[in-house]
Amino acid sequence: METIKKNEVKTGKVIDLTHEGHGVVKVDRYPIFIPNALIDEEIKFKLIKVKKNFAIGKLIEVISESDDRVTPPCIYYAKCGGCQLQHMTYRAQLDMKREQVVNLFHRKGPFENTVIKETIGMVNPWRYRNKSQIPVGQSNSNQVIMGFYRQRSHDIIDMDSCLIQDRQHQEVMNRVKYWLNELNISIYNEKTKTGLIRHLVVRTGYHTDEMMVIFVTNGATFKQSELLVNKLKKEFPNITSIKQNINNSHSNVIMGRQSMTLYGKDKIEDQLSEVTYHISDLSFYQINSSQTEKLYQQALNYAQLTGKEIVLDTYCGIGTIGLYMAPLAKHVYGVEVVPQAIKDAEDNATKNQLKNTTFECGKAEDVILTWKSQGIKPGVVMVDPPRKGCDETFLTTLLKLNPKRIVYISCNPSTQQRDAQILAEQYELVEITPVDMFPQTTHIETVALFVRKDEE
């Protein structure tokens, strides 16, 4: 094999992309991964890390460009770790994401006949985030900086704009940054674990335009909070809630468990279809509201509700998808391990006068067995777990429940594919639809339909 040495400069042709969007060049059979390179490009690159089984390269020059290459519109793209695909046309991004799902499911397990649909994309794949979590720090000259982390680090890149964030969030960020400097409010230092302001979090209701601003602080004492509240109220009249979240932990967790309302309401409202949701500072709510409606509509299509079905919504959170389906179901049962989320789900059901809903707090595998013993037989089960996927205990319990259809929403197709192999014992994985919830990034969301084998 040809010798591979660190700091060596080489040329080669990109033959594939990794799940991180990195170009793959092979020397003999040895893979080299190069960020920002595209398939079929002839490139010059420098080897910056060499391991036994792979190497990492840095792109120096594109000798022969792909038709899929575009100039990234963001001035921070080369440094910021928030986006990975701005150098790629949006059509190519959608194709890449579908291809990754195809590779996962058609090459592993009994899923070669599963239909993988085209990725559902956005008309305008920018400014889509309804929630911004912005780290706060200080420069070497002790000026307040706000932005996002440099790739693979906790170094904050001071930014005035971000093209995937809501435009209003940027305006709030820039004004708060100015006021923190003006008022000389202390900023949290990750190394010394001292200082007050850790993060600024902004949430907006996509359909209501209500805005919530959250100051995440290292401790409860926030002497100048009233000054900041008054400035925000005056400059941004659509702010309906300002909160302080206390996070004393010395970890990468952004928000703590304790919050207090400094101004306005405890929650903001948003709508999906005809359903209104109350969203708190700690609520899980999909980041991309317009794509969430497409995601949930596809899930609804797979569920094929006629009004006679009992629906079980596992990992239900604040009830978003269960309440979305409730108007078309006989009854919706939701289960979630987080007590506050269940309270929010019940409040949301009451707000929308959806009386055909029941929510219970507990582990899904325990609660659904209790419901089964009470004679509750769901025809459709909704599954929407965190990135780690489903616990095996839950999946084996789900097989005992034996519903006709399972609709599985995933933010991590790798764990979805792992879980699908367990469900394949009794279910046919009929179809998967990727939905692009996070344009310009490598993240993929999918919704999959499983049908009981005796129902095919």
Curated annotation (Swiss-Prot):
GO terms for biological process: rRNA base methylation. Its EC number is 2.1.1.-. Signal peptide: none annotated. Gene3D superfamilies: 2.40.50.1070, Nucleic acid-binding proteins (2.40.50.140), Vaccinia Virus protein VP39 (3.40.50.150). Pfam families: tRNA_U5-meth_tr. The active site is at 411 (nucleophile). It comes from the Bacteria. Residues 3-61 form the TRAM domain. S-adenosyl-L-methionine binds at residues 286, 315, 336, 384. [4Fe-4S] cluster binds at residues 74, 80, 83, 162. Keywords: 4Fe-4S, Iron, Iron-sulfur, Metal-binding, Methyltransferase, S-adenosyl-L-methionine, Transferase. One of its GO terms (molecular function) is metal ion binding. Belongs to the class I-like SAM-binding methyltransferase superfamily. RNA M5U methyltransferase family. This is Uncharacterized RNA methyltransferase SERP1435.
